[in-house]
Amino acid sequence: MPEETQTQDQPMEEEEVETFAFQAEIAQLMSLIINTFYSNKEIFLRELISNSSDALDKIWYESLTDPSKLDSGKELHINLIPNKQDQTLTIVDTGIGMTKADLINNLGTIAKSGTKAFMEALQAGADISMIGQFGVSFYSAYLVAEKVTVITKHNDDEQYAWESSAGGSFTVRTDTGERMGRGTKVILHLKEDQTEYLEEQRIKEIVKKHSQLIGYPITLFVEKECDKEVSDDETEEKEDKEEEKEKEEKESKDKPEIEDVGSDEEEEKKDGDKKKKKTKEKYIDQEELNKTKPIWTRNPDDITNEEYGEFCKNLTNDWEDHLAVKHFSVEGQLEFRALLFVP
């Protein structure tokens, strides 16, 4: 483990924050990503979702031999949470998570074998979208974020938080915030000119374009408003009831019981006079974005013509039925499965 560049003496009750320097090649890569203009910055979301999918694959594979691995969370999913007020976009998965050592090594101090090769490719004019092929896709977050916070929980370790504004160093600390059963939360603090990635339609567009066939559900959480009709005096309802109760108690002591035959009519008239007004009420809307599943992985005998048709329409945005489909696989030195549609 690398030596810390800073030691902070703090009281035991405060969080201990450790600061580490980025490995030289990673620092150069981040500088290149931040300071070079790229038109297709949207690929950051594809890469982070792909990382989440890989983490979910890992915990799923481990659970095949040890089902108790999922005791910290049975559901395997990815959530996308835009927050316009805080100007953050959060990607949450219930994957394998990272230990403290994973955070330090994987996100900064040990360069991947493809780091240098990717930098050379970028400088030679390669497209930034190739970043995932070189094992450094996490750093694509800095295409749109000025600061990134990673909160993670692995079954074998405590919950930790990693944070960096790409200034040559990053911090790691024990996280005492909201508890995670298991998984990773990547919080992107977006740049002022990148807030388009907080818009519901923009996120849906990117997921459909790049991540539609991810094997785990991707759910978008969006805060919305709806109109709620309330009466003018609804907010004062409690006070009115208390006053009425006090009045009734006082009258019951001072007067004999007399039936008021006109009280019902007066009450009905009073209710009819109450005016209604509309107020805005906020709620969180949840929508699964990748309902189209990779049907080529299934047995062709189990797939109906309707399922083939729905898959083709979602993939091509065509409203007409396809003419024919061929679903086949090849096994040998090279193995693959394929779907061939004739429109």
Curated annotation (Swiss-Prot):
Molecular function (Gene Ontology), one example: unfolded protein binding
Protein origin, superkingdom: Eukaryota
Modified residues (Phosphoserine): 263
UniProt xrefs under InterPro entries: HATPase_C_sf, Heat_shock_protein_90_CS, Hsp90_fam, Hsp90_N, Ribosomal_Su5_D2-typ_SF
Modified residue annotations for N6-(2-hydroxyisobutyryl)lysine: 112
Keyword Transmembrane helix part of the UniProt annotation: no
Any single Pfam family the record assigns to this protein: HSP90
Classification via SMART domains: HATPase_c
Acidic residues bias (residue ranges): 230-246, 259-268
Basic and acidic residues composition bias: residue spans: 247-258
GO cellular component: cytosol; extracellular exosome; perinuclear region of cytoplasm; plasma membrane; protein-containing complex
Location(s) in or outside the cell: Cytoplasm
Binding site for ATP: 51, 93, 112, 138
PROSITE patterns in alphabetical order: HSP90
Single GO biological process annotation from the record: protein stabilization
Keywords: ATP-binding, Chaperone, Cytoplasm, Hydroxylation, Nucleotide-binding, Phosphoprotein, Stress response
Function, in words: Putative molecular chaperone that may promote the maturation, structural maintenance and proper regulation of specific target proteins.
Family classification: Belongs to the heat shock protein 90 family.
PANTHER family, per the entry: HEAT SHOCK PROTEIN 90 FAMILY MEMBER (PTHR11528)
Subunit composition and interactions: Homodimer.
Protein name listed in UniProt: Heat shock protein HSP 90-alpha A2
